Amino acid sequence: MATACKRSPGESQSEDIEASRMKRAAAKHLIERYYHQLTEGCGNEACTNEFCASCPTFLRMDNNAAAIKALELYKINAKLCDPHPSKKGASSAYLENSKGASNNSEIKMNKKEGKDFKDVIYLTEEKVYEIYEFCRESEDYSPLIRVIGRIFSSAEALVLSFRKVKQHTKEELKSLQEKDEDKDEDEKEKAACSAAAMEEDSEASSSRMGDSSQGDNNVQKLGPDDVTVDIDAIRRVYSSLLANEKLETAFLNALVYLSPNVECDLTYHNVYTRDPNYLNLFIIVMENSNLHSPEYLEMALPLFCKAMCKLPLEAQGKLIRLWSKYSADQIRRMMETFQQLITYKVISNEFNSRNLVNDDDAIVAASKCLKMVYYANVVGGDVDTNHNEEDDEEPIPESSELTLQELLGDERRNKKGPRVDPLETELGVKTLDCRKPLISFEEFINEPLNDVLEMDKDYTFFKVETENKFSFMTCPFILNAVTKNLGLYYDNRIRMYSERRITVLYSLVQGQQLNPYLRLKVRRDHIIDDALVRLEMIAMENPADLKKQLYVEFEGEQGVDEGGVSKEFFQLVVEEIFNPDIGMFTYDEATKLFWFNPSSFETEGQFTLIGIVLGLAIYNNCILDVHFPMVVYRKLMGKKGTFRDLGDSHPVLYQSLKDLLEYEGSVEDDMMITFQISQTDLFGNPMMYDLKENGDKIPITNENRKEFVNLYSDYILNKSVEKQFKAFRRGFHMVTNESPLKYLFRPEEIELLICGSRNLDFQALEETTEYDGGYTRESVVIREFWEIVHSFTDEQKRLFLQFTTGTDRAPVGGLGKLKMIIAKNGPDTERLPTSHTCFNVLLLPEYSSKEKLKERLLKAITYAKGFGML
């Protein structure tokens, strides 16, 4: 006891740590032996141990189950078989197969040269070139292959490699040396590592790698987003070594061994929290320009993606901020790597409603990794995190009556705020903030994945938000507009059905007969008065009714609304609302676009109702013929208009202000303008407005002209129409506030949702059209019909679409997505063709001649208006 008291605290602590380390090493060794016994056996065919794979009665299990069982056997100190000499472990065989040539060369090298670089515990650029030169002179690359295999398969060694600073801390080096001493000749399976990890406590885990944070006191201080790895050096090394095919195989095999251990470290050991430099290994591996090659796609890259997905959110954010500083070519290379893996896995498997692509771990992991590259592309682009619309609007009024759930004491299940991606929160940047990414957003869309994705199942996973099921709607950048529109359709329909069920149950509870639909009965000649008055009453009394399915009825007409009547309703409303004579919007002849009239006499309520109509069109999957500049959709999503937006909405003014900014002379002397501008009211009378206080007395100079341009742009796009647009946006959000619209779509895609595609590809329409009632693609009337349609002018083609589908715009994805049906409607007759716009069905009699067919068809599409029952 006296002797123990004389020991210094440092010696005592050192001995305790050493004893603890030896105890853990012994435990880990036993667990690995149990795992090996369960997965490969002892080699004795007559073995009687029920916990040995060589026993004839042993029931086989997968690696994860074996890992858990190994831990249980360790705890009860179960029997261990003696190894049989005739048995060779699978892992050893794999190692020999993958590195057989290397092992033979190693023996020769040791005999011939006696130098194997076993003392290399981490790599630098200089050390790589030294070994490479040695191998080149001896014409034997085995030493370098072994070094690459050893360093690139060890997380601890790779983390220390290619540092910007030459020196490493004593704790790091000591930990790495201990790791090498304890390391077996064969790499252990990932599951065994996981079992050992579950047994170790957090204190033991932290001593496994050493306290790197203390060691950093000896090296240069780094900022929160800085990394210690020398990226340029890594690129030079890869450039030199990857040209050698033997060395490339070494990198490939090392990555196969590295990835499961990294996944284990991140899942169970919280390794990044203890050592942020752990991120270095992901940076190093991702610099390998051959990751997209076929050799990596089968095993190495999927394993690495699974490991990379385990990075905590903070680490992902740091990695994204680093990658955002890369060039567009570097971002594209990484993007193509993950896209290649996703495409390869999609086309090499058969996915359907039973075998979902969502269940493929490699595709899911690659999509999550691709998300990091996507955000790096966003952050590294032209980003504007300012100019956000201040959310100072009054809250949307709730219904004055209790819902069924509230009567029963529950909240409504669907009443959630818009979803926000955690990475956006971590980075402080949204996709909406990016004006121009490093590479285009379209390059991140994976069409083969979209083709096999079961959107109904994916939407379910998106709404449930379970950890077991992955939804690709959480990675909207990888989906095309058609797929996302289908997801939005499911969301809207489910919400409609939910409102319908709630209404029925509410009626039973209250004893009142309520309408399960949003029913609008309008007169065709007074459509604005009837529709807007009715919508205004609903918005004031019970805004939740706006989320019911729309049902339109034209007074005096027999049409039943299965979608087609609603389409015409929206078409007529839009024509009336955007009539310049009403004065709510101004029309620019040059751009063919509408803008809010700052001098409009209409009330805020009228603009709110216009927003409701726009929201209802999206909610009910109807296309509108509206022509807004892109800044309107950006403002709807929450961004204010800036000078750059003027180029689209007010091109003449934009060019004038641009010339002012680029003027090389003296602005004050030559132009003599101030911070006071002139606008015209509804009657053409001039109105003066000061952009700053006493603006008429402040001259514009070369120094303050940028401020003038920004203030002028802000006035035109924001302040002058603030009252009108705020009401418009409020009405839009009354319908879409609980929708994933903002989460899934960019402003450009919102415009596509509302307006449809401007490209009318009638060739695609012909290829996808189906036939019924006796017609086929080869029927004479059908061939003549398409010859006539293709000869139509653009205006006639739009009239034809209006006649058959209820709208003259192509849906999202183009006319090929329309699924039109042409059905035979009797023999030759004088009757005109008719249509079911709800179902995109054209009823076409079998006319006797092509001339008669054209005459009847033109008359039908030119004078078609109104609905009747056939």
UniProtKB/Swiss-Prot annotation:
Enzyme class: transferase
GO molecular function: transcription coactivator activity; ubiquitin protein ligase activity; ubiquitin-protein transferase activity; zinc ion binding
Induction cue: Up-regulated in response to neuronal activity.
Modifications the protein undergoes after translation, according to the UniProt entry: Phosphorylation at Tyr-654 by ABL1 impairs E3 ligase activity.
Pathway assigned to this chain's UniProt record: Protein modification; protein ubiquitination
Zinc finger region(s), C4-type: 42-81
Xref: Pfam families: AZUL (PF16558), HECT (PF00632)
SMART domains named in the record: HECTc (SM00119)
Biased composition regions of type Polar residues, renumbered to the chain: 208-220
Region (Disordered): 171-223
Tissues where this protein is expressed: Widely expressed. Most abundant in brain, heart and thymus.
Active-site residues from the entry: 838 (glycyl thioester intermediate)
GO biological process, one term: rhythmic process
Phosphoserine modifications at: 8, 213
Residues modified as Phosphotyrosine: 654
EC number: 2.3.2.26
Key words of the record: Biological rhythms, Cytoplasm, Metal-binding, Nucleus, Phosphoprotein, Proteasome, Transferase, Ubl conjugation pathway, Zinc, Zinc-finger
Record-annotated HECT domain positions: 542-870
Protein location: Cytoplasm; Nucleus
Reaction(s) catalysed by this chain's protein: S-ubiquitinyl-[E2 ubiquitin-conjugating enzyme]-L-cysteine + [acceptor protein]-L-lysine = [E2 ubiquitin-conjugating enzyme]-L-cysteine + N(6)-ubiquitinyl-[acceptor protein]-L-lysine
Basic and acidic residues compositional bias, start-end: 171-180
Subunit comment: The active form is probably a homotrimer. Binds UBQLN1 and UBQLN2. Interacts with the 26S proteasome. Interacts with BPY2. Interacts with HIF1AN, MAPK6 and NEURL4; interaction with MAPK6 may be mediated by NEURL4. Interacts with the proteasomal subunit PSMD4. Interacts with BMAL1. Interacts with ARC. Interacts with ESR1 and WBP2.
Additional remarks: The Ube3a locus is imprinted with silencing of the paternal allele in hippocampus and cerebellum in mice. A cysteine residue is required for ubiquitin-thioester formation.
PANTHER family for this protein: UBIQUITIN-PROTEIN LIGASE E3A, UBIQUITIN-PROTEIN LIGASE E3C
Biological function: E3 ubiquitin-protein ligase which accepts ubiquitin from an E2 ubiquitin-conjugating enzyme in the form of a thioester and transfers it to its substrates. Several substrates have been identified including the BMAL1, ARC, LAMTOR1, RAD23A and RAD23B, MCM7 (which is involved in DNA replication), annexin A1, the PML tumor suppressor, and the cell cycle regulator CDKN1B. Additionally, may function as a cellular quality control ubiquitin ligase by helping the degradation of the cytoplasmic misfolded proteins. Finally, UBE3A also promotes its own degradation in vivo.
UniProt protein name: Ubiquitin-protein ligase E3A
Lineage: Eukaryota, Metazoa, Chordata, Craniata, Vertebrata
